[in-house]
C-alpha cells in the first residue's frame, strides 16, 4: 500500500534537485540554459516559460506500443488500484520539486482508476483530488490544466460529444461536469478539451452536421456549467487533424477557430496548440501559433516535437532549437501565454526505460525552450525580421497601397491604376539571407 503523506516513499533517489550550472557544465542532471531567475526582457525565465509536466506520459506510460509489451517498470508500479494512484501522486510531487517546475497537467483517468460505475469512478477521483490538494498546500506547483479522457474506454468507440449514441453524450457530459468541479477544486488555470475520438472514419455512416452541432451544444453546456459553479479558468481546445479517427473535427488552428466562430463560442475558448499535431496537419508549429496569435486565440502550448518521417503522433521531447526559437518568437509577440504555459506533452522513447531518463528528457526540453526564449527575445529586440517585413510591404504605406488598406480603392480605381502602371517590379524575398541570420542568432546569442 502507498505510504501516507507523513511516511512517504522516496522516488528518483539518484536525482538531486536539478540546478542551473551554465552552458559549460558537463553534468547531465543540471540545466545548461534554463536559469529560472534570469531576467529575459522584463520577466524571469520561470515567468516567461511556465513549464508544466504531463502526468500521463511521465507517471502512467509504460512503453507499450503496437508491436511490444511494456518496457518501463517504475518504482510505483508495484502497487495497483487506488494504492497505485496514491503512489503516483507521491512520485509526481517529488519530481515536480526536483525539476522545480511551476505547473502540471492531467486527464481525469491519469490520476484515478475507473470504477465499475460512474459513481464509484467519481468517488475514486475525489480521494485522489483531495490528496493532490493536500500536496499542493506544501508545494509551489499549480495545476496548469486538467481534462477528461473520453477516448480510452470502449464506450467512446464512436466519439463522446460527437457520438451517434445519446447515452454516450450524456456520460461524457457527466464526466466533464466532474472535470470542471475538479478544476475549480484544484484551482486549475485552464480546462482543456481535446477531440479524442471526435471525428469520423467514413462519411458513409456519418451525419456530419448533427455531430458538429452536438459538439457545439456540448461546448456551450460546458461554458454554462462553469459559470454556474463559478469556475473562471480559461477554456482551451487542442486541435489535431487525425489519429485516432481519420478526420478529426478540430483539424488545425484555422479549422477550430472557424468552428468556434460558426457556433458563437469564440469569446469563451482559446487554443492549446501542440507541435506534433501541427506536423500531422502538414504545418510548421510556428504556423499554427501565428494563425492563432493574429486572431487572438493563442492560449497555451503542448511542448513536444514530431518526427516528419513518420505519420503518427510520436510526442518526442522538444530539442529542435529552430522550432523552440520560432515558437517563442510567436509567444513573445503574443505578450506571453497568459494563464497558459508550456506543457511537456512528451514521452521518453520506449528504449529509454530508466527513471533518470525522465529527468534527462525534461532537462533537454526546458533547456531548448530557454535557449529559444533568449534567441527570440534578441531577434525581436533587434527587429531583425520586423524591419525586413516592413520594407517588404512598404507599397501599402502610401499611394494606391494605402488606398487599398484604408478601403478607399475599388475595382474601377484599381483598373485605372493598373492601366497607367503596366511595368511591375518585384523585390527578392531573401529567404536564404533570413535563414542565415536566424542561424547566426541561434549560434551566437
From Swiss-Prot:
Reactions this protein catalyses: alpha-D-xylose = alpha-D-xylulofuranose
Location of this chain's protein in the cell: Cytoplasm
Binding residues for Mg(2+) 1: 238, 274, 302, 345
One of the GO biological process terms: D-xylose metabolic process
Cofactor(s) annotated in UniProt: Mg(2+)
One GO MF term attached to the UniProt entry: magnesium ion binding
Cytoplasm recorded as keyword: yes
Keywords: Carbohydrate metabolism, Cytoplasm, Isomerase, Magnesium, Metal-binding, Xylose metabolism
Source taxon at top rank: Bacteria
EC number(s) reported in the record: 5.3.1.5
InterPro entries reported in the protein's UniProt record: Xyl_isomerase-like_sf, Xylose_isom_bac, Xylose_isomerase
Broad class of enzyme this protein falls into: isomerase
Record bears the keyword Cytoplasm: yes
Cofactor note: Binds 2 magnesium ions per subunit.
Gene Ontology annotations for the cellular component aspect, listed alphabetically: cytoplasm
Binding-site list for Mg(2+) 2: 274, 277, 313, 315
Active site: residue positions: 107, 110
Subunit structure: Homotetramer.
Family: Belongs to the xylose isomerase family.
Listed name of the protein: Xylose isomerase
Organism in which the protein naturally occurs: Bacillus cereus (strain ATCC 10987 / NRS 248)
Record gene name: xylA
Amino acid at each position: 500500500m502507498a505510504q501516507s503523506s507523513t511516511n512517504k516513499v522516496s522516488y528518483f533517489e539518484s536525482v538531486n534537485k536539478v540546478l542551473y550550472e551554465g552552458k559549460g557544465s558537463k553534468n547531465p542532471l543540471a540545466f545548461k540554459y534554463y536559469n529560472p531567475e534570469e531576467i529575459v526582457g522584463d520577466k524571469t525565465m520561470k515567468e516567461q516559460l511556465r513549464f508544466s509536466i504531463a502526468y500521463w506520459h511521465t507517471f502512467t506510460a509504460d512503453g507499450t506500443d503496437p508491436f511490444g509489451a511494456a518496457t518501463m517498470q517504475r518504482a510505483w508500479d508495484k502497487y495497483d488500484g487506488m494504492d497505485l494512484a496514491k503512489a503516483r501522486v507521491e512520485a509526481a510531487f517529488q519530481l515536480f520539486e526536483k525539476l522545480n517546475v511551476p505547473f502540471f497537467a492531467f486527464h481525469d483517468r491519469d490520476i484515478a482508476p475507473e470504477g465499475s460505475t460512474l459513481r464509484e469512478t467519481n468517488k475514486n477521483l475525489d480521494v485522489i483530488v483531495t490528496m493532490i490538494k493536500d500536496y499542493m498546500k506544501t508545494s509551489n506547483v499549480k495545476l496548469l490544466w486538467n481534462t477528461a479522457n473520453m477516448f480510452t474506454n470502449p464506450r467512446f468507440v464512436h466519439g463522446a460529444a460527437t457520438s451517434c449514441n445519446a447515452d454516450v453524450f450524456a456520460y461524457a457530459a457527466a464526466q466533464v461536469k466532474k472535470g470542471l468541479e475538479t478544476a475549480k477544486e484544484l484551482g486549475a488555470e485552464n480546462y482543456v478539451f481535446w477531440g479524442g475520438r471526435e471525428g469520423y472514419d467514413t462519411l458513409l455512416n456519418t451525419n456530419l452536421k448533427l455531430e458538429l452541432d452536438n459538439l457545439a451544444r456540448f461546448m456551450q453546456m460546458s461554458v454554462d456549467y462553469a459559470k454556474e459553479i463559478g469556475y473562471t479558468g480559461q477554456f482551451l481546445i487542442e486541435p489535431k487533424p487525425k489519429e485516432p479517427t481519420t478526420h478529426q473535427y478540430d483539424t488545425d488552428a484555422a479549422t477550430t477557430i472557424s468552428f468556434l466562430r460558426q457556433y458563437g463560442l469564440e469569446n469563451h475558448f482559446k487554443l492549446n496548440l501542440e507541435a506534433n499535431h501541427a506536423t500531422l496537419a502538414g504545418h510548421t508549429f510556428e504556423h499554427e501559433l501565428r494563425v492563432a496569435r493574429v486572431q487572438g486565440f493563442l492560449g497555451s502550448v503542448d511542448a513536444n516535437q514530431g518526427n516528419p518521417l513518420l505519420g503518427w503522433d510520436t510526442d518526442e521531447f522538444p530539442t529542435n532549437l529552430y522550432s523552440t526559437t520560432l515558437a517563442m518568437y510567436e509567444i513573445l509577440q503574443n505578450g506571453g501565454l497568459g494563464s497558459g504555459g508550456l506543457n511537456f506533452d512528451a514521452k521518453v522513447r520506449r528504449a529509454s526505460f530508466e527513471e533518470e531518463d525522465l529527468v534527462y528528457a525534461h532537462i533537454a526540453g526546458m533547456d531548448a525552450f530557454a535557449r529559444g526564449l533568449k534567441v527570440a527575445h534578441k531577434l525581436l529586440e533587434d527587429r531583425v525580421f520586423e524591419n525586413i517585413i516592413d520594407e517588404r510591404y512598404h507599397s501599402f504605406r502610401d499611394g494606391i497601397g494605402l488606398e487599398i488598406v484604408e478601403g478607399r480603392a475599388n475595382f474601377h480605381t484599381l483598373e485605372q491604376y493598373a492601366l497607367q502602371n503596366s511595368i511591375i517590379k518585384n523585390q527578392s524575398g531573401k529567404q536564404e539571407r533570413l535563414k542565415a541570420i536566424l542561424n547566426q542568432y541561434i549560434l551566437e546569442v
